[in-house]
A protein has these predicted regions:
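Anion-binding and metal-coordination hotspots
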Residues: 1-167
């Protein structure tokens, strides 16, 4: 199921429902051995599993990175995405980079290694300021990935008090 979802995202960056349709059109279910196919509920179940295991997945992927990847340089970017739906735990009104007024959004932080390969993604409430996402990334790199000296590179300056980085 996880491979089917990845294939669907590579072929067409649509919704989960479009992934089900794509699997029917391209025989992905048959190729991967899903004798009864799959539906949107199966994909949501898969996303729940990924969410529950995200930390372990990211840690394992980090440990298998290219040997040339630095353990002390990381690239970090923050963006937001507005939502049309009503029921999302993280949705809140906040600074919208797309200029969408009156829309709830989520804030997304993407952490990459020095080669630009993603190592972690984190979702924050939509009213979280960019600077407030920074400390959790330092903590993640230190505690989860075991890196001692870290330089985070972003697209604009983020000022963090020294005592916040030593917690």
């Amino acid at each position: 199921m996880k491979i089917a979802q990845v294939i669907a995202r590579v072929l067409d960056q649509g919704s989960r429902l479009s992934a089900v349709r794509l699997a029917k059109e391209h025989a992905v279910a048959d190729v991967l051995g899903f004798t009864e196919g799959f539906n949107e509920d199966d994909l949501y179940g898969n996303l729940a599993w990924i969410s529950e295991n995200q930390g372990e997945i990211e840690s394992r992927l980090f440990s298998f990175r290219a040997p040339s990847a630095s353990r002390d340089i990381f690239l970090y970017d923050v963006t937001s995405s507005y939502l049309e739906g009503e029921d999302n735990y993280f949705s809140a009104y906040g600074y919208n980079r797309d200029g969408k007024k009156g829309k709830k959004q989520i804030v997304i932080g993407l952490l990459c290694d020095g080669n630009g390969d993603p190592v972690s993604v984190e979702v924050f409430p939509g009213n979280t300021q960019d600077m407030k996402t920074f400390f959790s990334q330092i903590q993640k790199v230190s505690e989860r990935f075991g890196c001692e000296r870290v330089t985070l590179v972003g697209d604009r300056p983020v000022y963090v008090r020294k005592e916040e980085t030593t917690r």
